[in-house]
């Protein structure tokens, strides 16, 4: 998510920057009016029924995603699988925006484990064509977007996804919000209001990258008993591929082995949850993907100690989700995020998909 302090810069880039829709502050009705104005003046145009292939190139790597409307289903159906816990605050904001706009403004990101024949051959066929859009995104990412209107390909995609569960990669709060909004709006099973905009990535895609999120504790007790190491780099090397966490306090790095299967789960269950008690994680935890930033926060007194984590294994995350287990908030960070503004999905209950 774009930090609040950076929003003015994005708004200044263009009168049509998507943050005017997705991040309107409390002016939800203003966002709705802006969307309708963009439609009226032709800046936004409705496609015929379509799916989309999205390709991103970054750091010498490439990832392909399918963008489509995904049916909203409760977690109990075991088709859409969560892997992180959510909190109330973010959902209230997103629900207010959905109620005002009645539009799915940015895709939720899902991961799937395809059958051998799978979806990838379909995407390969589409990628041989000329893309509809080519653009450059943040951090030097290169994007291409293809429009898929062929009903034969639509049917092939539907068949490939039949009985295939999907894991929420990014957007737990937004998914639960979309489901709540769908139940409010209602409509028959094939109504547009029963779906959300989804970006779907094969778990075996070599360009699917997951990064760790480190924790800084604002207050609490020291955690000791680990193996002393010389530096942050040695700490990160020491936890790689192990059920272990790195710690930093009083200018001292350690590698601390954990009992269990997934380091972030064990860290919270064995250490952090005991410190939090009944308080929410936001009260005592700061999060960063930059280990050096975590060290600096501790040195500057922003926090009393840091915990470093290795990136979780995706198949392990999927396995836990299939077992109905969730990880602590901010256990995974999928990278690079899909840019907002490529495709929108109207949630009109009178539209049929």
PLM regions with names:
Residues 1-353:
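Surface-exposed, charge/polar-rich loops and edge strands
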């Amino acid at each position: 998510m774009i930090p609040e302090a950076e929003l003015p810069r994005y708004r200044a880039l263009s009168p049509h920057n998507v943050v005017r829709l997705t991040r309107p502050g409390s002016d939800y009705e203003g966002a709705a009016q802006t969307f309708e104005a963009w439609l009226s003046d032709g800046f936004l145009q409705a496609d015929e029924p379509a799916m989309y292939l999205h390709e991103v190139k970054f750091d010498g790597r490439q990832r392909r995603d399918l963008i489509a409307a995904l049916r909203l289903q409760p977690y109990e159906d075991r088709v859409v699988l969560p892997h992180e816990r959510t909190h109330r605050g973010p959902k209230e904001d997103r629900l207010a925006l959905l109620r005002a706009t009645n539009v799915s403004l940015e895709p939720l990101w899902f991961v799937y484990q395809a059958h051998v024949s799978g979806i990838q051959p379909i995407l390969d066929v589409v990628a041989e064509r000329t893309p509809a859009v080519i653009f450059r995104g943040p951090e030097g990412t290169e994007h291409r977007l293809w429009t898929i209107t062929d009903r034969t390909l639509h049917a092939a995609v539907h068949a490939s996804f039949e009985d295939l569960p999907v894991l929420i990669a990014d957007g737990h709060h937004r998914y639960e919000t979309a489901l709540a909004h769908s139940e409010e709006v209602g409509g028959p099973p094939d109504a547009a209001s029963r779906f959300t905009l989804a970006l779907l990535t094969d778990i075996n895609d070599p360009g699917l990258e997951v990064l760790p999120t480190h924790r800084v504790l604002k207050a609490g007790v020291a955690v000791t008993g680990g193996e002393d190491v010389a530096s942050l780099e040695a700490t990160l090397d020491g936890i790689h591929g192990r059920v272990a966490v790195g710690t930093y306090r009083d200018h001292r790095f350690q590698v601390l082995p954990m009992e269990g299967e997934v380091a972030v789960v064990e860290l919270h269950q064995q250490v952090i949850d005991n410190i939090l008690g009944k308080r929410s994680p936001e009260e005592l935890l700061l999060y960063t993907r930059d280990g050096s930033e975590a060290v600096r926060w501790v040195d500057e007194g922003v926090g009393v100690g840091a915990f470093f984590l290795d990136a979780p294994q995706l198949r392990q995350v999927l396995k836990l989700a299939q077992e109905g287990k969730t990880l602590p908030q901010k256990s995974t960070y999928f990278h690079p995020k899909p840019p907002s503004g490529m495709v929108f999905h109207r949630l009109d209950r009178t539209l049929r998909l």
